[in-house]
Amino acid sequence: GVDKPGCRYMFGGCVQDDDCCPHLGCKRKGLYCAWDAS
């Protein structure tokens, strides 16, 4: 994820990893942000 205004927190809706806040990635099966292993 990225640090930008409006970034999605845990379980926020997303289409891609860049929609999520830092340390979060988009889980495409559920279209929500969750912890990214990286």
Swiss-Prot record:
The keyword Secreted applies. Pfam families: Toxin_12 (PF07740). GO terms for cellular component: extracellular region. Expressed by the venom gland. One of its GO terms (molecular function) is toxin activity. Disulfide bonds join C7-C21, C14-C26, C20-C33. InterPro entries: Huwentoxin-1. SUPFAM superfamilies: omega toxin-like (SSF57059). The modification Serine amide is found at S38. It is found in: Secreted. Keywords: Amidation, Calcium channel impairing toxin, Disulfide bond, Ion channel impairing toxin, Knottin, Neurotoxin, Secreted, Toxin, Voltage-gated calcium channel impairing toxin, Voltage-gated sodium channel impairing toxin. The presence of a 'disulfide through disulfide knot' structurally defines this protein as a knottin. Paralytic toxin on insects that inhibits voltage-gated sodium (Nav) and calcium (Cav) channels in P.americana (American cockroach) dorsal unpaired median (DUM) neurons, and also inhibits the B.germanica (German cockroach) Nav channel (BgNaV1). May act as a gating-modifier toxin on Nav and as a pore blocker on Cav. In vivo, reversibly paralyzes both L.cuprina (Australian sheep blowfly) and M.domestica (housefly), but does not affect larvae of H.armigera (cotton bollworms). Possibly exists in two forms, due to cis-trans isomerization of Pro-5 or Pro-22. Belongs to the neurotoxin 10 (Hwtx-1) family. 28 (Jztx-11) subfamily. This is Mu/omega-theraphotoxin-Mb1b.
